[in-house]
Structure formats: structure tokens, C-alpha cells
Amino acid sequence: MIVIPAIDLKNGQCVRLRQGLMEDTTVFSDSPVEMAEQWVKQGARRVHLVDLNGAFEGRPVNVSSVTEVVSAFPDLPVQIGGGIRNMQIANAYIEAGIDYLIIGTMAVTNPEFVSELCREFPSKVIVGLDANDGLVATQGWTQQTDLNVVNLSKKFEQYGVSSIVYTDIARDGMMQGVNIEATVDLAKQTSIPIIASGGISNMEDIFGLLVEAHHGIMGAIIGRAIYEGTLDFKQAQQFCDAN
């Protein structure tokens, strides 16, 4: 299981939101490249970038910050989400050197877009499913649907999606611990590898996920915990490697 540091971008800065609320923002750095360098030095094998402005506006906004990170670390796999709503945007990111495209809202509202992307960019497409009590939310979490996250994930198995980033909205940015039960339940019911996200706050959460990783949990995205110091990133990755 790999530990993936999250770098959330808002107006060119590295920030964290609480429960996806743009008005509840904490700024951690003015330099995404320096932040990425910090995690690379500690052994990061992939970074998770989110264009928060893009997620809310439906188009890429922090493109320059994203491309700076990719250029600075050409050997570092990068996954990007937020505002990827058409093939033109997806193609631009792939050409810029992005390794994985995370499709959130469009995966829910237009699943055929995911199918098209998988055909165009095999093994480079990740679906981001954000759920509240097992029901999917979209549009930067502002729109709640009545779609069951497990049922929706099964739809993507036939497309060749490389993984699913599963975020429990109620836990995200709240440092309350990851929803292991819901994450494992999803992993058991789909053949697509799961990347856990939302609420991971300490080594206990990492251990809890690692114990269940054999069900298909391939990674864990960590945000606020590594910025506020409740989780040591290097220690977490070394622990996963040793077990």
C-alpha cells in the first residue's frame, strides 16, 4: 500500500479545506513545488494534486502550478483532479506529463466520458467517488445524489479504470479517522483497486487500512494530518513497506 500526499491548490497556494468548503481554508504553503519536494524527500512515490478552483468552476484554474510540479519532478507519478470535464483538458494534462487523471463529477453525470478517456488513455484514468453515508456527491461536494457508491463503482469495471479514489465526505479534513468499514466494503465489492481518502489522521488509521489492504486497497491519500503533524509521512510509508 502506498501513502500518497495530497497537495490541494487554490489560487496557486497549497491549502486544505474542511469537508470541501471553499470558505473554510487553511493555507500551508505558497509554493506547490516546494511542498512536493518535501514529500519526495520523505519517500513519496506518487502525489495527489487537486485543482480546487477547477473543481468548483468546472475548468482547470491552477494549471501553471500543476505543470511546475510535473516539470520539477519528471520521475514522480502525479495524479490530478478538479475540473477535468472534457477531452481537450484531459489531453492537455497528459501532454504536460500528468500520469493519472481523476474524474469526479463527470464520472457521475456522464459515465461515457470515462469510457472514452479509458480508450484514449489506457491505465491513466482514475475515478473519484465522494460519498456521504454511501451516497455519491458531485460538483465539489455541493450536490448530493441518490446514487449508491458501490453500484456506481461496478459500472466502471468494464471501462478499464485504473483505480477509484474513495472519499468519505463526512470525515474529510476533520481529522476524525478514516471510515475503514465503508472503504473495505467498497473494495470487497469491486474489482477496481481502491485508494482511500478522507479523515486519515494517524498511524492507527494507516494500520487499519493496511490490515485490510488485501481486499484491494492500494493506497491512502493523506492531507491535513501530514501538514498539521499528527502523522509522519515517512514513517507511514516505511511502515507500509515493512508490512
Curated annotation (Swiss-Prot):
Q: Where in the cell is it found?
A: Cytoplasm
Question: Which class of enzymes does this protein belong to?
Answer: isomerase
Please list the residues that make up the active site: D8, D130
Recite the UniProt keywords alphabetically: Amino-acid biosynthesis, Cytoplasm, Histidine biosynthesis, Isomerase
Q: Which GO terms describe its molecular function?
A: 1-(5-phosphoribosyl)-5-[(5-phosphoribosylamino)methylideneamino]imidazole-4-carboxamide isomerase activity
Offer a single GO CC term for the protein: cytoplasm
- E.C. numbers: 5.3.1.16
Keyword Transcription regulation assigned to the entry: answer is: no
* Coarse class of the protein's main subcellular location: cytoplasm
Does the keyword Amino-acid biosynthesis belong to this entry? yes
Q: In which pathway does it act?
A: Amino-acid biosynthesis; L-histidine biosynthesis; L-histidine from 5-phospho-alpha-D-ribose 1-diphosphate: step 4/9
Report which reactions are catalysed by this protein.
Answer: 1-(5-phospho-beta-D-ribosyl)-5-[(5-phospho-beta-D-ribosylamino)methylideneamino]imidazole-4-carboxamide = 5-[(5-phospho-1-deoxy-D-ribulos-1-ylimino)methylamino]-1-(5-phospho-beta-D-ribosyl)imidazole-4-carboxamide
Q: Name one GO biological process term.
A: L-histidine biosynthetic process
In the record, the note on similarity to other proteins reads: Belongs to the HisA/HisF family.
Matching entries from NCBIfam families are given as: 1-(5-phosphoribosyl)-5-[(5-phosphoribosylamino)methylideneamino]imidazole-4-carboxamide isomerase (TIGR00007), PRK13585.1 (NF010112)
- Protein name in UniProt: 1-(5-phosphoribosyl)-5-[(5-phosphoribosylamino)methylideneamino] imidazole-4-carboxamide isomerase
Q: Which organism is it from?
A: Ruthia magnifica subsp. Calyptogena magnifica
